[in-house]
Each structure stands twice: as C-alpha cells, then as structure tokens.
C-alpha cells in the first residue's frame, strides 16, 4: 500500500527562490491538516528562476536543519498536476498574502482543475507578521535594491 493510500498527503509547490519564514509557516500549518507534505521545488517559465538544483538543495537543507518530519523535498521540472497524478495526491497547498495573490491563485487553481479535475487547492492566509515577506523582496534587499525594482 502506498503512502497516499494510508495517509492524507498534499503538495506544496513553488519556485522557492528563497524558502523564507512565510513558506515555513504555511508548511507547519499544513502539517496540522495533512499527514505528509511534498515540497515540490518547481520551474516557473514566467519567472526568472535560479538553477533548479540549487533551489532544491537550499530547501532540502533548510528542512533538514529544522528536523521537520513528514516532509519530502522534490525537484520537479514538469506540471505540478503531473506530479499529483503520479503520486495520487489530490491536494495542493498555497499561501495568500493579499488581494493580488488571491487573483493570481484563483487563476492557478483554475489551471490545476483543467489539468486534473480531482485536484483541490487549500489556501492558507499569511499571518499578519509575515504578509510582507516575499522571495522577490528578500532577493532585492540582498542586491541592495528597493522593493519595487526587479
């Protein structure tokens, strides 16, 4: 019997340019609802992403350093819905910080449903103290840019 038949699992997909406290918060909250979480470090063709292998390694190191159980970090270069089908996972978790995120996430959820109608997206709203954190802001700060530069 596979893990997914015994336990309720979900997918936490993202490019994870920086796996930050907002992501970690969503992961910990998801583990309260799900028995197992696959963090899927993915490619987003609409974003400029750093090397998939490097991003995967950074996320895996972070999870290992925190000794978080019932999580597996995966690198994936295809559709998230394909990963879900292969693993027979019906839930994807996503975070929402604001109205702009909501619009984008609704669009993405519709795509997931078109690709595989068994998928459901479970949303976690950012905690107030974390809603201004984003990978892009962290990258820009590290480069000495303000929040609005790309």
From Swiss-Prot:
User: Which UniProt key words apply to this protein?
Assistant: ATP-binding, Coenzyme A biosynthesis, Cytoplasm, Magnesium, Nucleotide-binding, Nucleotidyltransferase, Transferase
Which GO MF terms are attached to this record? Answer: ATP binding; pantetheine-phosphate adenylyltransferase activity
Site annotation (Transition state stabilizer) points to 23
The UniProt entry, under SUPFAM superfamilies, shows: Nucleotidylyl transferase
In this record, what's one Pfam family? CTP_transf_like
Top-level taxon of origin: Bacteria
Keyword Nucleotide-binding set for record: yes
Q: Does the keyword Transferase apply?
A: yes
Tell me the enzyme class.
transferase
Q: Which pathway does this polypeptide act in? A: Cofactor biosynthesis; coenzyme A biosynthesis; CoA from (R)-pantothenate: step 4/5
Q: Binding residues for ATP, per the UniProt record? A: 15-16, 23, 95-97, 105, 130-136
> GO CC terms on record?
cytoplasm
Function noted in UniProt: Reversibly transfers an adenylyl group from ATP to 4'-phosphopantetheine, yielding dephospho-CoA (dPCoA) and pyrophosphate.
Q: What is this protein called?
A: Phosphopantetheine adenylyltransferase
Q: Which organism is it from?
A: Malacoplasma penetrans (strain HF-2) (Mycoplasma penetrans)
Q: What is the lineage of its organism?
A: Bacteria, Bacillati, Mycoplasmatota, Mycoplasmoidales, Mycoplasmoidaceae
